[in-house]
Amino acid sequence: MVKLAFGSVGDSFSATSIKAYVAEFIATLLFVFAGVGSAIAYGQLTNGGALDPAGLVAIAIAHALALFVGVSVAANISGGHLNPAVTFGLAVGGHITILTGVFYWVAQLLGATVACLLLGFVTHGKAIPTHAVAGISELEGVVFEVVITFALVYTVYATAADPKKGSLGTIAPIAIGFIVGANILAAGPFSGGSMNPARSFGPAVAAGDFAGNWVYWVGPLVGGGLAGLVYGDVFIGGSYQQVADQDYA
């Protein structure tokens, strides 16, 4: 059962919430800067060569490490979502209100966009790589993104949002980073392995290329929502209950 709660203006504009939005902006900026930056660096080192297995591994590791750090530095303030699909999945499971979630989205999208604009500036206008399906149809790309984002948000629930997580919560950031790195290795050559609408939106804005960008909204949001339904309803149950900031917003 969906446990969506709209929330109140007062709660969404409280000092604690404002700090959470700023934390999401900064953490998403740092994550996307490192993630997209690793792809740009690969192109620089290979003179624009095609992605090879070693490059895929390097980019996957860069994303995993950057997300581990991003989640860690924001966890005690905002919960460390860094991803509209994670925020949506947690909203479906009743762990963040819709109104607050919308502002999380704004912060995440702005952070990703600023990161890519900064990369364009500091690399003297190097092309910002955007996500695009390769060798498969866009519909197949959506399914790919649904599956890998489900895995990501399910991991978030199991290690961070579940009130029964106990000491497992201490490894949440690294577990989340690991699943993202693994999913990039699996999906990178096909859908790009986004799992994150903000991670795809920022480069699209900086490059002015939104071709196929809808894939990276539909797939991750469906996958994140399904994970919220499954874990939130089957394994947690109950009604709406805001999770404390220090646990996972």
UniProtKB/Swiss-Prot annotation:
Motif (NPA 1): 83-85
Location(s), subcellular: Vacuole membrane
CDD domains (UniProt xref): MIP
GO biological process: water transport
UniProt entry keywords in alphabetical sequence: Membrane, Repeat, Transmembrane, Transmembrane helix, Transport, Vacuole
Gene Ontology molecular function: water channel activity
Bilayer disposition of the protein: Multi-pass membrane protein
Name of the protein in question: Aquaporin TIP2-1
